[in-house]
């Protein structure tokens, strides 16, 4: 069971971001095809980076009892793929959340500016 610890933490974290995404319809629950394409492309790019790092001797898999031991390629554990997918989706959710917050702030500011002032009845 301890061999699944890291993967379990990743899955729980991924689920938390999916809940946030679902609640505010930020990425996968707003445009599922676009989000899937972005996450897939990002994971492919990052896995390519990992493979190049392994080949050049910069990256290697550390030994630990907390990982499953499943490898998708030499020196690249299954948990790495899950982490890269999580990281990619997290980036989409963060970018969409910041964009929505900025839009909301701008719209609120514009709405306040168009209302008449309480004191003079003039627009600000």
UniProtKB/Swiss-Prot annotation:
E.C. no: 5.5.1.-
Family: Belongs to the lycopene beta-cyclase family.
Gene Ontology MF: a single term: intramolecular lyase activity
Name listed for the protein in its UniProt record: Putative C(50) carotenoid beta-cyclase subunit A
Domain of life: Bacteria
Presence of the UniProt keyword Isomerase in the record: yes
Species of provenance: Dietzia sp. (strain CQ4)
GO cellular component terms listed in the entry, alphabetical order: plasma membrane
